[in-house]
A protein has these predicted regions:
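Conserved acetyl-CoA-binding loop-helix of GNAT-fold acetyltransferases
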Residues: 89-104, 125-130
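Conserved beta-strand-loop-alpha-helix junction that forms the acyl-donor binding cleft
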Residues: 114-124, 142-144
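Terminal substrate-recognition subdomain of acyl/acetyltransferases
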Residues: 81-82, 139, 145-160
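Conserved acetyl-CoA-binding loop of GNAT-fold acetyltransferases
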Residues: 129-139
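Extreme N-terminal starter segment of soluble prokaryotic enzymes
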Residues: 1-2
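Hydrophobic pocket/interface hotspot
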Residues: 14, 18, 39
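Acetyl-CoA-dependent GNAT
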Residues: 5-9, 27-86, 97-99, 103, ...
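Conserved GNAT acetyl-CoA-binding A-motif
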Residues: 104-117
Length: 160
């Protein structure tokens, strides 16, 4: 699997991945009716670096990395990951995360923080914990899940 920086030619493949995830409204605090243009502007924004995971010429996942805060907090990075639902369970998110750790270290980040991991996204919570993240905060009932109602969001953190 090749993980490489995304470019404008990847936009339709990235939308094919992030669009259904956004529309489902189960894991990201984004408007479910976000337009393709706005979703891509968010995912590929100028404040972040965006990557794609590609296998045999097919993009199966994407992630971004950015500084979590400005100024005195810019040594901590934040990432977002999405994989093609049809490619779930193949370790793509794990591979992208491993790549993001290496990239974060190379960029001089000292830690990685996920600000809003929806607690009902159990696969993600378990994956991040298996990769050394700790839950350092729990925000009660802050995410309105489309089928589970109000659920908690977790703040997850690890040093690099």
């Amino acid at each position: 699997m090749l993980i490489r920086p995304a470019n404008n030619d990847d936009r339709s493949a990235i939308w094919r991945i992030i669009g259904p995830t956004i529309r489902a409204g189960e894991t990201y605090a984004l408007d479910r009716d976000l337009s393709e243009a706005d979703a891509l502007a968010y995912w590929m924004g100028p404040d972040r670096e965006t990557f794609v995971a590609e296998e045999d010429g097919v993009i199966l996942g994407t992630y971004y990395i950015k500084a979590n805060q400005a100024g005195g907090g810019r040594h901590v990075c934040n990432c977002g990951y999405m994989t093609d639902p049809a490619a779930g369970g193949r370790g793509i998110a794990r591979r992208m995360h491993e790549h993001s750790l290496e990239h974060a270290r190379a960029r001089g980040f000292r830690a990685m923080q996920f600000n809003f991991v929806v607690s009902s996204n159990r696969r993600a919570v378990e994956l991040w914990q298996s990769l050394g993240f700790e839950v350092v905060g729990q925000l009660p009932g802050v995410f309105l899940h489309p089928t589970e109602g109000y659920v908690d969001a977790l703040v997850m953190f690890r040093t690099l």
